[in-house]
Amino acid sequence: MIIGVPKEIKNNEYRVAITPDGVKELCARGNRVYIENNAGLGSGFSNAEYEDMGAEILYSPKELFEKSEIIYKVKELFPEEFDYLKEGQIIFTYIHSNAFREQTDALLEKKVIGIAYEDITDKNNEFPLLKPMSEIAGKGGFLMAVQCVQKINGGNGLMLADVCGVKKAEIVVIGAGNSGLGAAELAASLGNKVTVLDINTVKLERAKEVLPKGVEFLYSNKKNIEDCIKKSDVLINCILWPKHRTDHLITRDMLKLMKPNSLIVDVSCDEGGAIETCRSTSHDNPVYSEGGIIHYCVDNIPSAFSQTATTSLCNATLPYLIEIASKGVRKALCENEHLRRGLTCYDGVLTLEETGLKQKRPYSSPEEVLNIV
């Protein structure tokens, strides 16, 4: 198949969907790969490195979309890309259709086949294409906290590392998933006092097995959260709040319980979600203060670690892309139920129930549109 890799156009997005080694894998299987000019520079990969592995460089995103059967990306599509879409084209990326109604309109209108990384499952009913970015986002979120608490950056002047004779900084991590484990592991390894909260006791038990000794694990309820945020120097949120809920885990009033000028890092960054006062920021302008508390709410933290993130993401997504390219998209979707869970739209039909309910659109199941009995 013909696979096109465009340059990401989101603000401060330095990742790219594929590494040169990934191109080599695709070309060895008879696929043709187009890379947009300088698409990999932000991740440390030159045009020449891609060409050496068999890719062809195109200098126009319009031409790349026109020539490609599969568009292989990192982030969602932006309005300036909508007109490039063509009927039957496969869009393989993080789509996040719930959050971007205009994108959903375009995908349906153009009758493309959208397959979202974030919804693909595995045999354990987990999300293998979220895991690599979640881990990097969690660890990256803590590394950003290290900078934000420095006095020169407007923080309280703390060092988030163990210093002999000095009280340890208190790091509270909400969520024991991949992001939370990443944040807690790094924070604990530097000698901070770390507390992890989750409503899932199985996740807490797993976290206890892998995290360093000394980390405290608490069931996430209102009292425990309030007790923890009173003492926290850094609060790191790593849970995605259910989209149908209108309440919040950390309300605006609860900020009054926190130490003045302490820090919230919202790795999940779902506006109006777990943290009421969260609103998305960018790497250009990452923090703001509300209620006397510093908020760091950048919604693409992994982009700051672009070379690592690109390599990790490509390692995770490439086997699925190879399956689609080898079998053809319909056969791949019919034979692989886990890949099928990622189907967002097909031939003008929305196939993701969650988006249908949220955006009040008609939808069908993937099995219905693929005529799977």
What are these regions (language model features)?
Residues 67-68, 232:
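An anion/phosphate-binding loop that grips the pyrophosphate of nucleotide cofactors and donors
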